[in-house]
Protein backbone atom coordinates (compact mmCIF):
# COMPACT_ATOMS: atom_id res chain seq x y z
CA UNK A 1 0.00 0.00 0.00
CA UNK A 2 1.21 3.53 -0.80
CA UNK A 3 2.90 5.15 2.20
CA UNK A 4 0.71 8.27 2.10
CA UNK A 5 -2.41 6.12 1.86
CA UNK A 6 -1.30 4.17 4.94
CA UNK A 7 -0.84 7.40 6.89
CA UNK A 8 -4.22 8.64 5.64
CA UNK A 9 -5.86 5.45 6.96
CA UNK A 10 -4.15 6.08 10.32
CA UNK A 11 -5.62 9.61 10.44
CA UNK A 12 -9.04 8.36 9.34
CA UNK A 13 -9.16 5.87 12.22
CA UNK A 14 -7.67 8.35 14.72
CA UNK A 15 -10.51 10.82 14.36
CA UNK A 16 -13.19 8.23 13.66
CA UNK A 17 -12.61 7.05 17.24
CA UNK A 18 -13.47 10.53 18.51
CA UNK A 19 -16.34 11.23 16.14
CA UNK A 20 -18.27 8.20 17.38
CA UNK A 21 -19.23 9.90 20.64
CA UNK A 22 -17.91 13.47 20.92
CA UNK A 23 -21.01 15.30 19.67
CA UNK A 24 -23.71 12.84 20.79
CA UNK A 25 -22.47 11.62 24.17
CA UNK A 26 -24.70 14.12 26.01
CA UNK A 27 -27.85 12.36 24.79
CA UNK A 28 -26.83 9.09 26.44
CA UNK A 29 -25.58 10.75 29.63
CA UNK A 30 -29.05 12.19 30.21
CA UNK A 31 -30.60 8.73 29.93
CA UNK A 32 -27.88 7.23 32.15
CA UNK A 33 -28.62 9.62 35.01
CA UNK A 34 -25.58 11.79 34.36
CA UNK A 35 -27.31 14.62 32.53
CA UNK A 36 -26.23 17.23 35.07
CA UNK A 37 -22.62 16.10 34.61
CA UNK A 38 -22.38 16.58 30.82
CA UNK A 39 -20.04 19.54 31.24
CA UNK A 40 -17.65 17.48 33.37
CA UNK A 41 -17.35 14.80 30.69
CA UNK A 42 -16.14 17.42 28.23
CA UNK A 43 -14.04 19.21 30.85
CA UNK A 44 -12.22 15.94 31.51
CA UNK A 45 -10.86 16.07 27.97
CA UNK A 46 -9.48 19.54 28.66
CA UNK A 47 -8.01 18.56 32.02
CA UNK A 48 -6.09 15.56 30.69
CA UNK A 49 -4.97 17.65 27.70
CA UNK A 50 -3.05 19.90 30.07
CA UNK A 51 -0.51 17.23 31.01
CA UNK A 52 -0.96 13.89 29.23
CA UNK A 53 0.20 14.94 25.71
CA UNK A 54 3.40 16.38 27.21
CA UNK A 55 4.11 13.25 29.23
CA UNK A 56 3.50 10.95 26.29
CA UNK A 57 5.60 13.24 24.10
CA UNK A 58 8.55 12.76 26.44
CA UNK A 59 8.06 8.97 26.31
CA UNK A 60 7.90 9.07 22.50
CA UNK A 61 11.05 11.19 22.33
CA UNK A 62 13.14 8.98 24.61
CA UNK A 63 11.81 5.49 25.20
CA UNK A 64 9.19 4.07 22.80
CA UNK A 65 8.92 4.57 19.06
CA UNK A 66 6.00 6.95 18.38
CA UNK A 67 4.00 4.55 16.20
CA UNK A 68 4.19 1.86 18.89
CA UNK A 69 3.26 4.29 21.67
CA UNK A 70 0.34 5.48 19.53
CA UNK A 71 -0.86 1.90 19.24
CA UNK A 72 -0.47 1.18 22.96
CA UNK A 73 -2.35 4.35 23.88
CA UNK A 74 -5.22 3.27 21.65
CA UNK A 75 -5.24 -0.20 23.16
CA UNK A 76 -5.80 1.24 26.64
CA UNK A 77 -8.17 3.99 25.42
CA UNK A 78 -10.23 1.41 23.54
CA UNK A 79 -10.31 -1.05 26.43
CA UNK A 80 -11.58 1.57 28.87
CA UNK A 81 -14.14 2.84 26.34
CA UNK A 82 -15.42 -0.70 25.81
CA UNK A 83 -15.71 -0.83 29.60
CA UNK A 84 -18.07 2.17 29.40
CA UNK A 85 -20.12 0.33 26.79
CA UNK A 86 -20.28 -2.79 28.95
CA UNK A 87 -21.59 -0.84 31.94
CA UNK A 88 -24.33 0.67 29.78
CA UNK A 89 -25.16 -2.73 28.30
CA UNK A 90 -25.40 -4.31 31.75
CA UNK A 91 -27.68 -1.51 32.96
CA UNK A 92 -29.98 -2.10 30.00
CA UNK A 93 -31.57 0.11 27.37
CA UNK A 94 -33.11 3.31 28.76
CA UNK A 95 -31.95 2.65 32.33
CA UNK A 96 -29.74 4.67 34.64
CA UNK A 97 -26.24 3.41 35.39
CA UNK A 98 -26.08 1.76 38.83
CA UNK A 99 -22.40 2.67 39.35
CA UNK A 100 -21.93 6.14 37.92
CA UNK A 101 -18.57 6.73 39.61
CA UNK A 102 -17.00 3.70 37.92
CA UNK A 103 -18.37 4.82 34.54
CA UNK A 104 -16.82 8.27 35.01
CA UNK A 105 -13.50 6.68 36.03
CA UNK A 106 -13.42 4.45 32.94
CA UNK A 107 -14.26 7.38 30.68
CA UNK A 108 -11.55 9.53 32.29
CA UNK A 109 -8.92 6.83 31.79
CA UNK A 110 -9.97 6.41 28.16
CA UNK A 111 -9.61 10.15 27.56
CA UNK A 112 -6.25 10.21 29.35
CA UNK A 113 -4.87 7.73 26.83
CA UNK A 114 -6.74 9.07 23.79
CA UNK A 115 -5.95 12.80 23.99
CA UNK A 116 -2.15 12.33 23.58
CA UNK A 117 -2.74 10.32 20.40
CA UNK A 118 -3.81 13.43 18.46
CA UNK A 119 -0.29 14.87 18.76
CA UNK A 120 1.31 11.42 18.39
CA UNK A 121 -0.52 10.89 15.10
CA UNK A 122 1.05 14.09 13.76
CA UNK A 123 4.47 13.03 15.06
CA UNK A 124 4.22 9.64 13.34
CA UNK A 125 3.07 11.17 10.05
CA UNK A 126 5.76 13.87 10.00
CA UNK A 127 8.52 11.44 11.00
CA UNK A 128 7.63 8.82 8.38
CA UNK A 129 7.21 11.41 5.63
CA UNK A 130 10.59 12.99 6.41
CA UNK A 131 12.38 9.64 6.66
CA UNK A 132 11.08 8.81 3.19
CA UNK A 133 12.15 12.20 1.76
CA UNK A 134 8.60 13.41 1.22
CA UNK A 135 7.49 17.05 1.51
CA UNK A 136 5.51 17.48 4.74
CA UNK A 137 4.09 20.85 3.66
CA UNK A 138 2.72 19.38 0.44
CA UNK A 139 1.86 15.84 1.51
CA UNK A 140 0.55 16.20 5.09
CA UNK A 141 -2.60 18.35 4.54
CA UNK A 142 -4.36 15.74 2.33
CA UNK A 143 -3.45 13.08 4.90
CA UNK A 144 -4.90 15.20 7.73
CA UNK A 145 -8.10 15.90 5.81
CA UNK A 146 -8.82 12.16 5.93
CA UNK A 147 -8.97 12.58 9.71
CA UNK A 148 -11.90 14.97 9.34
CA UNK A 149 -13.51 12.53 6.89
CA UNK A 150 -13.16 9.78 9.50
CA UNK A 151 -14.74 11.98 12.17
CA UNK A 152 -17.70 12.74 9.91
CA UNK A 153 -18.05 9.09 8.84
CA UNK A 154 -18.57 7.81 12.37
CA UNK A 155 -20.88 10.72 13.17
CA UNK A 156 -23.08 9.63 10.29
CA UNK A 157 -22.80 5.97 11.29
CA UNK A 158 -23.91 6.43 14.92
CA UNK A 159 -26.59 8.88 13.77
CA UNK A 160 -28.27 6.28 11.55
CA UNK A 161 -27.33 2.87 13.01
CA UNK A 162 -29.60 1.10 15.49
CA UNK A 163 -30.12 -2.30 17.09
CA UNK A 164 -33.57 -3.37 18.26
CA UNK A 165 -35.55 -6.60 18.58
CA UNK A 166 -35.68 -6.88 14.79
CA UNK A 167 -31.90 -6.68 14.46
CA UNK A 168 -29.38 -4.18 13.12
CA UNK A 169 -30.32 -1.43 10.68
CA UNK A 170 -30.06 2.18 9.56
CA UNK A 171 -32.67 4.94 9.60
CA UNK A 172 -33.00 8.70 9.36
CA UNK A 173 -36.37 8.53 11.08
CA UNK A 174 -37.30 8.54 14.77
CA UNK A 175 -35.83 5.58 16.65
CA UNK A 176 -34.86 5.72 20.33
CA UNK A 177 -32.35 2.90 19.82
CA UNK A 178 -30.10 4.76 17.43
CA UNK A 179 -26.48 4.58 18.57
CA UNK A 180 -26.40 8.37 19.01
CA UNK A 181 -28.76 7.94 21.99
CA UNK A 182 -27.31 4.76 23.53
CA UNK A 183 -24.20 3.18 24.99
CA UNK A 184 -23.44 1.66 21.55
CA UNK A 185 -21.56 4.83 20.56
CA UNK A 186 -18.88 3.87 23.09
CA UNK A 187 -18.67 0.38 21.61
CA UNK A 188 -18.04 1.81 18.13
CA UNK A 189 -15.33 4.12 19.50
CA UNK A 190 -13.67 1.37 21.53
CA UNK A 191 -13.58 -1.14 18.68
CA UNK A 192 -12.07 1.44 16.31
CA UNK A 193 -9.37 2.18 18.90
CA UNK A 194 -8.48 -1.50 19.08
CA UNK A 195 -8.35 -1.68 15.27
CA UNK A 196 -6.00 1.31 15.21
CA UNK A 197 -3.86 -0.34 17.90
CA UNK A 198 -3.30 -3.30 15.58
CA UNK A 199 -2.84 -1.08 12.53
CA UNK A 200 -0.12 1.00 14.19
CA UNK A 201 2.14 -2.05 14.39
CA UNK A 202 2.02 -2.38 10.60
CA UNK A 203 3.39 1.14 10.07
CA UNK A 204 7.07 1.83 9.27
CA UNK A 205 9.29 2.31 12.29
CA UNK A 206 10.01 5.83 13.55
CA UNK A 207 13.58 5.97 14.79
CA UNK A 208 14.25 7.51 18.18
CA UNK A 209 16.55 10.53 17.92
CA UNK A 210 18.94 10.94 20.83
CA UNK A 211 19.39 14.59 21.74
CA UNK A 212 22.89 15.80 22.46
CA UNK A 213 23.63 17.31 25.85
CA UNK A 214 21.48 17.34 28.94
CA UNK A 215 17.93 18.58 28.71
CA UNK A 216 16.40 20.02 31.87
CA UNK A 217 13.05 18.86 33.18
CA UNK A 218 11.67 22.35 32.57
CA UNK A 219 12.66 22.12 28.90
CA UNK A 220 11.20 18.63 28.59
CA UNK A 221 7.88 19.81 30.00
CA UNK A 222 7.89 22.93 27.84
CA UNK A 223 7.90 25.25 30.86
CA UNK A 224 10.36 27.64 29.20
CA UNK A 225 7.49 28.95 27.08
CA UNK A 226 5.92 30.56 30.15
CA UNK A 227 8.61 33.25 29.90
CA UNK A 228 6.50 34.65 27.06
CA UNK A 229 4.04 36.02 29.63
CA UNK A 230 6.63 38.70 30.44
CA UNK A 231 5.81 40.30 27.08
CA UNK A 232 2.55 42.25 27.18
CA UNK A 233 1.30 41.30 23.72
CA UNK A 234 2.06 37.61 24.21
CA UNK A 235 0.42 37.65 27.64
CA UNK A 236 -2.69 39.26 26.14
CA UNK A 237 -2.67 36.75 23.29
CA UNK A 238 -2.56 33.75 25.63
CA UNK A 239 -5.26 35.25 27.88
CA UNK A 240 -7.57 35.76 24.91
CA UNK A 241 -6.68 32.25 23.71
CA UNK A 242 -8.06 30.91 26.97
CA UNK A 243 -11.16 33.12 26.69
CA UNK A 244 -11.81 31.88 23.16
CA UNK A 245 -11.08 28.34 24.30
CA UNK A 246 -14.06 28.69 26.64
CA UNK A 247 -16.28 28.54 23.53
CA UNK A 248 -14.71 25.44 21.98
CA UNK A 249 -16.53 22.55 23.65
CA UNK A 250 -19.87 24.25 24.39
CA UNK A 251 -21.62 23.10 21.22
CA UNK A 252 -19.89 19.70 21.26
CA UNK A 253 -21.42 19.11 24.67
CA UNK A 254 -24.85 20.68 24.31
CA UNK A 255 -25.81 20.98 20.62
CA UNK A 256 -26.86 17.30 20.54
CA UNK A 257 -29.11 17.40 23.62
CA UNK A 258 -30.50 20.78 22.47
CA UNK A 259 -31.49 19.59 18.99
CA UNK A 260 -32.79 16.27 20.29
CA UNK A 261 -34.91 18.05 22.94
CA UNK A 262 -37.28 19.18 20.16
CA UNK A 263 -38.50 15.57 20.01
CA UNK A 264 -40.35 16.40 23.23
CA UNK A 265 -42.45 18.98 21.35
CA UNK A 266 -45.18 17.21 19.30
CA UNK A 267 -44.94 19.52 16.27
CA UNK A 268 -41.19 18.82 15.96
CA UNK A 269 -41.06 15.20 17.21
CA UNK A 270 -40.67 13.67 13.75
CA UNK A 271 -38.61 16.45 12.17
CA UNK A 272 -35.34 15.62 10.43
CA UNK A 273 -33.25 17.96 12.62
CA UNK A 274 -34.59 16.63 15.92
CA UNK A 275 -34.02 13.00 14.92
CA UNK A 276 -30.65 13.45 13.23
CA UNK A 277 -28.79 15.87 15.49
CA UNK A 278 -25.44 14.14 14.98
CA UNK A 279 -25.75 14.16 11.20
CA UNK A 280 -26.85 17.81 11.18
CA UNK A 281 -23.93 18.93 13.35
CA UNK A 282 -21.52 17.07 11.05
CA UNK A 283 -21.96 20.06 8.72
CA UNK A 284 -19.70 21.83 11.23
CA UNK A 285 -16.86 19.42 10.47
CA UNK A 286 -17.40 19.78 6.71
CA UNK A 287 -17.22 23.55 7.11
CA UNK A 288 -14.06 23.16 9.18
CA UNK A 289 -12.36 21.22 6.38
CA UNK A 290 -13.35 23.83 3.78
CA UNK A 291 -12.37 26.85 5.87
CA UNK A 292 -8.81 25.58 6.28
CA UNK A 293 -8.39 26.17 2.55
CA UNK A 294 -9.61 29.78 2.89
CA UNK A 295 -7.18 30.82 5.63
CA UNK A 296 -4.14 31.64 3.41
CA UNK A 297 -6.21 34.13 1.37
CA UNK A 298 -7.70 35.85 4.42
CA UNK A 299 -4.38 36.05 6.26
CA UNK A 300 -2.60 37.63 3.31
CA UNK A 301 -5.52 39.97 2.56
CA UNK A 302 -6.46 41.12 6.08
CA UNK A 303 -3.68 40.12 8.49
CA UNK A 304 -3.65 38.03 11.65
CA UNK A 305 -5.65 40.33 13.96
CA UNK A 306 -8.60 40.66 11.57
CA UNK A 307 -8.67 36.91 10.96
CA UNK A 308 -8.71 36.29 14.72
CA UNK A 309 -11.54 38.81 15.08
CA UNK A 310 -13.48 36.99 12.37
CA UNK A 311 -13.20 33.87 14.50
CA UNK A 312 -14.38 35.58 17.68
CA UNK A 313 -17.41 37.15 16.01
CA UNK A 314 -18.15 33.88 14.20
CA UNK A 315 -18.68 32.36 17.66
CA UNK A 316 -21.33 35.04 18.29
CA UNK A 317 -23.22 33.81 15.22
CA UNK A 318 -22.54 30.15 16.05
CA UNK A 319 -24.37 30.50 19.38
CA UNK A 320 -26.87 33.13 18.23
CA UNK A 321 -28.18 31.08 15.32
CA UNK A 322 -28.86 28.17 17.68
CA UNK A 323 -30.86 30.55 19.87
CA UNK A 324 -32.97 31.71 16.92
CA UNK A 325 -33.57 28.42 15.11
CA UNK A 326 -36.00 25.51 15.36
CA UNK A 327 -36.35 22.22 13.40
CA UNK A 328 -39.13 23.48 11.11
CA UNK A 329 -38.68 25.63 8.02
CA UNK A 330 -37.40 28.32 7.94
CA UNK A 331 -35.99 27.93 11.48
CA UNK A 332 -33.82 24.95 10.54
CA UNK A 333 -31.87 27.23 8.18
CA UNK A 334 -30.43 28.98 11.24
CA UNK A 335 -29.21 25.61 12.56
CA UNK A 336 -27.48 24.98 9.24
CA UNK A 337 -25.95 28.48 9.25
CA UNK A 338 -24.67 27.88 12.78
CA UNK A 339 -22.90 24.75 11.56
CA UNK A 340 -21.50 26.50 8.47
CA UNK A 341 -20.07 29.40 10.48
CA UNK A 342 -18.37 26.93 12.85
CA UNK A 343 -15.56 26.44 10.35
CA UNK A 344 -14.62 30.13 10.59
CA UNK A 345 -15.05 30.15 14.37
CA UNK A 346 -12.84 27.11 14.95
CA UNK A 347 -10.20 27.28 12.22
CA UNK A 348 -9.50 30.98 11.89
CA UNK A 349 -8.26 31.44 15.45
CA UNK A 350 -6.52 28.09 15.83
CA UNK A 351 -4.49 28.36 12.62
CA UNK A 352 -3.82 32.11 12.70
CA UNK A 353 -2.98 31.85 16.39
CA UNK A 354 -0.44 29.14 15.65
CA UNK A 355 1.13 31.32 12.96
CA UNK A 356 1.26 34.30 15.36
CA UNK A 357 3.07 32.18 17.96
CA UNK A 358 5.48 30.93 15.31
CA UNK A 359 6.29 34.49 14.23
CA UNK A 360 6.73 35.92 17.72
CA UNK A 361 8.75 33.22 19.47
CA UNK A 362 12.41 32.30 19.68
CA UNK A 363 13.05 29.21 17.51
CA UNK A 364 14.37 27.38 20.59
CA UNK A 365 10.98 27.46 22.30
CA UNK A 366 8.61 27.40 19.33
CA UNK A 367 7.44 23.86 20.00
CA UNK A 368 6.88 24.63 23.69
CA UNK A 369 5.09 27.87 22.81
CA UNK A 370 2.75 26.00 20.47
CA UNK A 371 2.10 23.55 23.29
CA UNK A 372 1.31 26.46 25.61
CA UNK A 373 -1.10 27.89 23.03
CA UNK A 374 -2.92 24.55 22.81
CA UNK A 375 -2.94 24.23 26.60
CA UNK A 376 -4.54 27.66 27.03
CA UNK A 377 -7.23 27.00 24.38
CA UNK A 378 -8.00 23.27 24.50
CA UNK A 379 -6.90 22.74 28.10
CA UNK A 380 -7.53 25.62 30.49
CA UNK A 381 -10.01 27.59 28.38
CA UNK A 382 -12.08 24.64 27.21
CA UNK A 383 -12.28 23.20 30.74
CA UNK A 384 -13.43 26.44 32.38
CA UNK A 385 -15.80 27.22 29.52
CA UNK A 386 -17.44 23.81 29.50
CA UNK A 387 -17.99 23.77 33.26
CA UNK A 388 -19.40 27.31 33.20
CA UNK A 389 -21.68 26.44 30.28
CA UNK A 390 -22.86 23.39 32.19
CA UNK A 391 -23.87 25.52 35.17
CA UNK A 392 -25.81 27.88 32.88
CA UNK A 393 -27.60 25.04 31.07
CA UNK A 394 -28.44 23.26 34.33
CA UNK A 395 -29.93 26.50 35.67
CA UNK A 396 -32.29 27.04 32.75
CA UNK A 397 -32.91 23.46 31.56
CA UNK A 398 -33.57 20.04 33.10
CA UNK A 399 -33.96 16.43 31.98
CA UNK A 400 -37.57 15.30 31.66
CA UNK A 401 -39.19 12.08 30.44
CA UNK A 402 -41.48 11.96 27.39
CA UNK A 403 -43.30 9.20 25.55
CA UNK A 404 -42.39 9.36 21.85
CA UNK A 405 -43.90 6.74 19.50
CA UNK A 406 -44.52 4.46 22.48
CA UNK A 407 -40.93 4.70 23.81
CA UNK A 408 -40.00 6.41 27.08
CA UNK A 409 -37.26 8.95 26.31
CA UNK A 410 -35.42 11.63 28.28
CA UNK A 411 -34.72 15.11 26.87
CA UNK A 412 -32.97 18.20 28.20
CA UNK A 413 -35.72 20.83 27.95
CA UNK A 414 -36.10 24.40 29.17
CA UNK A 415 -35.11 27.94 28.25
CA UNK A 416 -32.43 27.09 25.69
CA UNK A 417 -32.72 30.47 24.02
CA UNK A 418 -31.41 32.25 27.12
CA UNK A 419 -28.48 29.81 27.28
CA UNK A 420 -27.44 30.35 23.66
CA UNK A 421 -27.81 34.13 23.86
CA UNK A 422 -25.71 34.14 27.05
CA UNK A 423 -22.92 32.28 25.24
CA UNK A 424 -23.23 34.63 22.25
CA UNK A 425 -22.99 37.69 24.51
CA UNK A 426 -19.82 36.33 26.11
CA UNK A 427 -18.21 35.81 22.69
CA UNK A 428 -19.27 39.32 21.63
CA UNK A 429 -17.71 40.94 24.72
CA UNK A 430 -14.47 38.99 24.25
CA UNK A 431 -14.37 40.01 20.58
CA UNK A 432 -14.84 43.70 21.38
CA UNK A 433 -12.15 43.62 24.10
CA UNK A 434 -9.77 41.80 21.75
CA UNK A 435 -10.30 44.44 19.06
CA UNK A 436 -9.52 47.22 21.54
CA UNK A 437 -6.53 45.92 23.52
CA UNK A 438 -4.72 43.47 21.22
CA UNK A 439 -2.38 45.36 18.90
CA UNK A 440 0.16 43.02 17.30
CA UNK A 441 3.01 44.35 15.23
CA UNK A 442 2.18 43.97 11.55
CA UNK A 443 4.50 41.48 9.88
CA UNK A 444 4.43 40.13 6.33
CA UNK A 445 3.22 36.57 6.02
CA UNK A 446 5.56 35.00 3.54
CA UNK A 447 4.54 31.39 3.82
CA UNK A 448 1.57 29.69 5.38
CA UNK A 449 1.58 25.98 6.17
CA UNK A 450 -0.80 23.79 8.09
Where are these regions (language model features)?
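Juxtamembrane intracellular "pre-TM" segments in multi-pass secondary transporters
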Residues: 1, 203-239, 264-266
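C-terminal transmembrane helical hairpin of 12-TM major facilitator-type secondary transporters
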Residues: 305-353
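Central cavity-lining transmembrane alpha-helices of secondary-active solute carriers
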Residues: 40-61, 279-295
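Cytoplasmic membrane-interface "Motif A"-like loop-to-helix N-cap segments
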Residues: 61-75, 300-312
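A membrane-interface helix-boundary motif in multi-pass transporters
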Residues: 160-191, 391-427
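C-terminal ends and interior cores of transmembrane alpha-helices
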Residues: 75-97, 313-329
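Multi-pass alpha-helical transporter architecture, strongest
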Residues: 55, 84-89, 192-204, 379, ...
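Helix-loop boundary and gating motifs at the non-cytosolic
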Residues: 1-50, 233-269, 276-280, 350
Amino acid sequence: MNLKVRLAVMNFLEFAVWGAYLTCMGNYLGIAGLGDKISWFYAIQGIVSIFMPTLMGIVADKYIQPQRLLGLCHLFAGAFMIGCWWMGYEAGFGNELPNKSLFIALYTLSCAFYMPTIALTNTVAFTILKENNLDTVKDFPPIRVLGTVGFIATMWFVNCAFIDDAGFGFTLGENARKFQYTYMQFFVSGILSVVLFAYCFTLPQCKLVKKEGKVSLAESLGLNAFKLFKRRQMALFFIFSALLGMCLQVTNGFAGPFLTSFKGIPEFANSFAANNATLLTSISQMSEACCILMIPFFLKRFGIKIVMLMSLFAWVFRFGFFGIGNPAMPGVIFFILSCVVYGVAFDFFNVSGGIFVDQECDPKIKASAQGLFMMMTNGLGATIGTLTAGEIVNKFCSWEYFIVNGEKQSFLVGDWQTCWFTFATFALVVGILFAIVFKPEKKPIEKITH
